[in-house]
Design a protein with these regions (language model features):
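Short alpha-helix
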Residues: 165-181
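Core SAM-dependent methyltransferase catalytic element
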Residues: 189-206
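A conserved beta-strand element that flanks and buttresses the S-adenosyl-L-methionine
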Residues: 111
Length: 206
C-alpha cells in the first residue's frame, strides 16, 4: 500500500471533486444508519477505519458531542487535520494501518468507507474487523465495486490516480462477509452521477 499518495492528498482532500459525488453522499448514507443507532445508545463505541480528515467524525459529533469515536488512518497528514477539526473529548484519532491496529476493546459499530479496496489481504482484514466488533454490533462498509464493464473502466482510472487497489464485485464482497460470520442486513447502491462507478454500501451485523 503506497501511503505517500494519501499524505500528499491530505491538504486538499476536503476540496477534491469526489467529495461532491462520492465522499459526501457516502457520509450522508452512512449517517442515515449510524445516527439512529447512536440515538438509541449514546454510549456506543465507534471505530472509523480510514477516517481521512475526520469529516464523518465531525458531522456525527456535532449531533452527539459525547460520542465515543476512534478514527485510524495510515496518513499522518490526514490524522493531523482530523485532530485539528475535531475537539470533542471522546473523539480520538491515531496514525495506524488496520493491519497493525491492536484494539484493547471491542466496538459497537465499525465503519470503513472507501478504504477496503486498498487492503492487500481482504479476507484477513474482514476477519479482523469482525473480531473487533462486539456480538450484536454492526459493521458499515462502503466502497467502489466492479460489477460491469463501465465499473471496470472507471475503477481502472480511479486506481491510477490513487494507489494499488482491488474493487471487488458485490457477490465477492458477500462471499467474504459470509466466511467471517457477518450477516448482511442491507445492501444499498449510492447513485449520484452516471459517470461514477457502483458505490456499494453494506450494513452488517455480527
Amino acid at each position: 500500500m503506497r501511503y505517500e499518495v494519501w499524505e500528499k492528498l491530505a491538504h486538499k482532500y476536503n476540496r477534491l471533486w469526489v467529495q461532491k459525488y462520492s465522499l459526501r453522499p457516502t457520509r450522508r448514507d452512512v449517517k442515515t444508519i449510524l445516527l439512529p443507532l447512536i440515538k438509541k445508545n449514546p454510549d456506543l463505541k465507534i471505530l472509523d477505519i480510514g477516517c481521512g480528515t475526520g469529516q464523518l467524525a465531525k458531522e456525527v459529533s456535532a449531533r452527539f458531542p459525547k460520542i465515543n469515536y476512534m478514527g485510524i488512518d495510515v496518513a499522518s497528514n490526514m490524522v493531523a487535520l482530523a485532530k485539528a477539526s475535531n475537539k470533542g473529548e471522546n473523539v480520538r484519532f491515531k496514525v495506524c494501518p488496520i493491519e497493525k491496529f491492536n484494539a484493547d476493546e471491542k466496538f459497537d459499530v465499525i465503519i470503513c468507507t472507501h478504504s477496503f479496496p486498498y487492503f492487500p489481504d481482504k479476507e484477513k482484514m474482514i476477519g479482523k474487523i469482525a473480531d473487533m466488533c462486539k456480538e450484536g454490533g454492526n459493521v458499515i462498509i462502503v466502497n467502489s465495486s466492479t460489477n460491469s464493464l463501465k465499473d471496470l473502466i472507471i475503477n481502472f482510472f480511479l486506481k491510477a490516480t490513487t494507489s494499488k487497489a482491488e474493487y471487488l464485485s458485490i457477490p465477492k464482497m458477500k462471499k467474504l462477509f459470509k466466511a467471517t460470520g457477518l450477516t448482511l442486513k442491507k445492501k444499498h447502491i449510492i447513485r449520484e452521477k452516471f459517470y461514477m462507478p457502483t458505490l456499494a454500501l453494506f450494513y452488517l451485523e455480527k
